[in-house]
Amino acid sequence: AQYGRELLSCVPENPDQSILDLGCGTGTLTHALLEKSASVTGLDSSPEMIAKARQLYPGMDFRVLDARLMPWRNRFDIVFSNAALHWIPDHGTLLNAVSRVLKPQGKLVCEFGARLNILRIREAFRTALERRSLPYTTRFYFPAAEEYGSVLEQAGLRPETMKEFDRPTPLKGGPDGLRNWACQFFREDLNNLHEEQRIQIFKEMEDSLKDELWDGSQWVADYRRIRVTAAR
């Protein structure tokens, strides 16, 4: 959420506008968006995340919903999203839904993983799986800016700004930071493995990444981001 506050600067202030926070998680940035507008809705596909958001920010409008199935039409002036859209592989369907819920001249303001995002970590994980003859499935969408411009246009959205940039990001947890992060990010691949297998995979990842991503006190993930604003 601390990095998401940079993205907030791309959202204009207007008390009369309506904002949708897509992939809102536990609602930290949804609540911060009240500085920009009095009408803010948070949406996430995780019931657990939304339950926490409602607990933290009672009285705010939070919905459990798949972003590709949003029911509204011409409803929001701004669709905002931070660090969420890479979890949705099918951006054609997603952006058609975003275009549908935006009002005419409404804007998409988003940031998520770009091409080469966590490349070193993904390759270390893939290698550890392949060593055990286990398949690695790409479950994320990390586009390049030039590629994403075409995807936006096909959904009826006009790109205004697109920027790719590196964002080395410290992982919480000290020596356990990488494996804690991997448990979350690669959970679908790890869920079917025995605990001993998971521990061995984490150890191999740590050994192969230590020279590049361990700074002596914490793991620093090789994040790369794309920041986009587009208009309907």
Each predicted region: which residue ranges?
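Conserved class I S-adenosyl-L-methionine
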Residues: 107-131
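A short acidic, Gly/Pro-enriched loop at the edge of an enzyme's catalytic core
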Residues: 68-79
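A short glycine-rich, Lys/Arg-flanked "PGG" loop and its adjoining helix->strand segment in the class I
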Residues: 92-107
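Class I SAM-dependent methyltransferase SAM/SAH-binding core
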Residues: 20-69
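Short alpha-helix
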Residues: 141-155
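Conserved alpha-helix/loop element of class I SAM-dependent methyltransferases that forms part
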Residues: 1-17
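A short SAM/SAH-binding and catalytic strip from SAM-dependent methyltransferases
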Residues: 78-91
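C-terminal helical/coil "lid" or tail adjacent to the Rossmann-like core of SAM-dependent
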Residues: 160-215
